[in-house]
Amino acid sequence: MKSVTVAGIDCGTNSIRLKVSRVSEDGVEDIGPRILRVIRLGQDVDKTHRFADEALARAYEAAREFAGVLAEHPVDGIRFVATSATRDAENREEFEDNIEKILGVRPEVIPGTEEADLSFLGATSIVHREVEAPYLVVDLGGGSTELVLGGDGVTHPSTQVQAAFSMNIGSVRMTERHLKNDPPTEGQIAEAVADIDAHIDEAFKTVPAGKTHTIIGVSGTVTTMTALAMGLTEYDHTAVDG
């Protein structure tokens, strides 16, 4: 297998990230820095169903930074995926057009089901083989959350998805919808919890979570909480991942 250098850009509701890797028979090797920028693209999208001008400006600024990195690390291909906020935004074509002008690649707006599958594949690819399946992958994003159950305990990384569900609850969406004060009131917290519980009850009609042996958390929300629990003063993905 000839080695190829590829770039992946993941544009979510709260953050956008870039990873450049060389893929060969020997595996995957990171090339250059991993970059994450908090752009809050989903600002007010839950309420207005449109991208705000200032949110688009932040996204374009990050895209221009990524273009500079890619100029230093030429790639054979780029995949740019956009998720929850872009799915919901009525003016997403403007976003897609401008990103294509900056990066030369058009954002691919993927459905929640594909987001769930990709989250599962990515998460299980770094799980140690001795971690027992089935796995429940929880991808808690800014605009949506995906629950994915799967894994046969043999295939690695696992592609054996048994059930998946994507729901419109996430850290940005719930904050804007319910948590109007800082700190939020007890009533606002109760409203958020009730909203989340209702969505989870619906998800569990599709995803038989009772079969889970290992829960795997994915996303900035999960890694931030993990870093806090570990007492990290600076975020270190090598300490948190896996």
Regions found by a protein language model. Give the residues of each.
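N-terminal glycine-rich anion-binding loops that anchor highly charged ligand groups
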Residues: 27-40
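Helical "lid/coupling" subdomains associated with nucleotide-phosphate turnover
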Residues: 4-6, 22-23, 40, 44-75, ...
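Residues forming anionic-ligand binding surfaces in small-molecule and nucleic-acid pockets
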Residues: 78
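A short acidic Gly-Thr/Ser loop motif
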Residues: 10-15, 138-144, 218-221
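N-terminal basic/disordered segments at the start of proteins
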Residues: 2-30
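Beta-sandwich strand segments
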Residues: 28-30, 157-160
